[in-house]
Amino acid sequence: MPRSNRNDNFIDKSFTVMADLIVKLLPINARSKEAYVYYRDGLSAQNDGDYAEALENYDEALKLETDPTDRGETLKNMAIIYMSNGEEERAIETYQKALDENPKQPSCLKNMGLIFEKWGRIAEESGQQDDADRWFDQAADVWTQAVRLNPGGYLDIENWLKSTGRSNVDVYF
């Protein structure tokens, strides 16, 4: 039984019913509709904290989905799960795959930067300043791209870039 049929929350169930109706009415092929069902069930499982089920659904959605924007969104959600589970290298790889599908996803860049910045802090705390600087520079590179894609959307990142001296003036224009 699809996860959406097991949902007891009235609002979620209502949203699911409406989304299903819209998908049925849209002039898209059956394969894309099936991919959407897997994606939707993956989102539901992810929101419930059932990451294994979410990843299974996302994998199935990726097997069916051909649209790069939708594939990128699915991969981004998978990367978020890997990041939540502490699988940071796998998260980075999956965020990169998401960006390969759809390069206009600033949240992927933002999250990659969070991982690089964390690794930089860990290296710095371990007295490995050269490694820390490399990680911080990588964080700055992806965060600069994120800010360019979403100006004003990541004020905390803009402040970090400025306060660490890693800001490019052209980012803000």
Swiss-Prot record:
Gene Ontology annotations of biological process type: photosynthesis
TPR repeats: 35-68, 72-105, 120-153
UniProt topology in membrane: Peripheral membrane protein
SUPFAM superfamilies: TPR-like (SSF48452)
Subcellular location: Cellular thylakoid membrane
Keyword vocabulary terms for this entry: Membrane, Photosynthesis, Repeat, Thylakoid, TPR repeat
One GO cellular component, as annotated: plasma membrane-derived thylakoid membrane
Record's function text: Essential for the assembly of the photosystem I (PSI) complex. May act as a chaperone-like factor to guide the assembly of the PSI subunits.
HAMAP family registered for this protein in UniProt: Ycf3
Family named by the database record: Belongs to the Ycf3 family.
Protein's recorded name: Photosystem I assembly protein Ycf3
Source species: Synechococcus sp. (strain CC9902)
Gene label: ycf3
